[in-house]
From Swiss-Prot:
Naturally occurring in which organism (per UniProt): Pseudoalteromonas atlantica (strain T6c / ATCC BAA-1087)
Molecular functions (GO terms): RNA binding
Keywords, comma-separated and alphabetical: RNA-binding, Transcription, Transcription antitermination, Transcription regulation
Protein's UniProt name: Transcription antitermination protein NusB
GO biological process, one term: transcription antitermination
GO cellular component entries: cytosol
InterPro entries found in the cross-reference section: NusB-like_sf (IPR035926), NusB_fam (IPR011605), NusB_RsmB_TIM44 (IPR006027)
Assigned protein family: Belongs to the NusB family.
Name of the gene: nusB
Function: Involved in transcription antitermination. Required for transcription of ribosomal RNA (rRNA) genes. Binds specifically to the boxA antiterminator sequence of the ribosomal RNA (rrn) operons.
Amino acid sequence: MKPAARRKARELAVQAVYSWQMSKNPLDQIELSIVTSNNMQDVDTEYFLELLRAVVRRTAELDAKIKPYLGRLPEELDPVENAILRLATYELVERIDVPYKVVINEAIELAKSFGAEESHKFVNGVLDKAIKTLRKHELS
């Protein structure tokens, strides 16, 4: 699958996770809303669904993995930053086939697109600390 299709999958996944965080609507309802309101032709749909379902299913586990690197309480996170960090944490932990530099770069781009003005700096800082533990095998 082309990198652009993966990027679009991540964009839609962040939007869907954000929607789920804010509304707590059932996952299948959120999936349907995203899929029917977007042109999925240029999206790695399988990757989108994997990211969304895994992040929603494993929220507590992902939050626990990223919490030591936040520098603030998880409940103080901006909901967009939270969605991006959950998604990136899942990729760092489970998608070893995706290089950590790609995960971080994609998360920064998502934060620039959807987050507040300084979100990308915060996301970068958190993930830069997290990779030292979550992807230490790639750093040596």
